[in-house]
């Protein structure tokens, strides 16, 4: 019983929280082909990939104040919708787009974590990305197609063990 239970701990497959600022991976990593590790740079060097600092967003969005890409009118993803989300980013970081300065008046964003592994699980992003060369999509799914990010895989112990078996990971050394 206990083994079966442990194999299913933390199943949140399909979990798709609404974030305080809408962020479309479909636009950023899909249409614009921004590499995952540009924003999630800590995945290369750390146990955790983490949520990027808004400063990373501002690397581009200091100069991109309006959305000028494809729309999905059926779902309400219009140019105005996306532009308003950029304005939320500006408000959060205290960016005055007219004066093009940071005001110091910031409002921290309370992002909702999507992938929550139990405390007893040891997972190291850097080990998987650098040593094994695992593509982000292996665990995170087709992120470049996700308008709203969600937990693609179950990330259970059984799911991980199955991947290790299929890829012949040497767990003895």
Name these PLM-found stretches.
Residues 1-4:
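Hydrophobic membrane-insertion alpha-helices, especially the h-region
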Residues 8-13:
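Early transmembrane hairpin module of multi-pass membrane proteins
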Residues 17-69, 118-173:
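Sequence context surrounding c-type heme c attachment/ligation sites in exported
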Residues 55, 64-121, 169-173:
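Primarily the internal scaffold of c-type cytochrome electron-transfer domains
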């Amino acid at each position: 019983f206990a083994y079966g239970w442990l194999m299913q701990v933390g199943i949140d497959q399909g979990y798709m929280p609404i974030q305080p600022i809408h962020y479309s991976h479909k636009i950023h990593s899909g249409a614009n082909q921004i590499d995952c590790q540009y924003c999630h740079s800590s995945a290369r060097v750390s146990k955790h990939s983490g949520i990027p600092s808004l400063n990373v967003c501002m690397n581009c969005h200091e100069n991109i104040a309006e959305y000028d890409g494809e729309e999905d009118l059926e779902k309400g993803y219009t140019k105005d919708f996306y532009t308003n989300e950029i304005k939320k980013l500006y408000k959060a970081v205290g960016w005055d787009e007219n004066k093009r300065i940071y005001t110091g008046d910031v409002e921290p964003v309370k992002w909702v974590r999507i992938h929550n592994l139990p405390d007893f699980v040891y997972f190291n992003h850097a080990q998987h990305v650098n040593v094994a060369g695992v593509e982000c999509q292996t665990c995170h799914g087709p992120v470049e197609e996700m308008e709203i990010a969600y937990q693609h895989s179950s990330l259970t112990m059984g799911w991980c063990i199955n991947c290790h078996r299929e890829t012949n990971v040497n767990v003895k050394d």
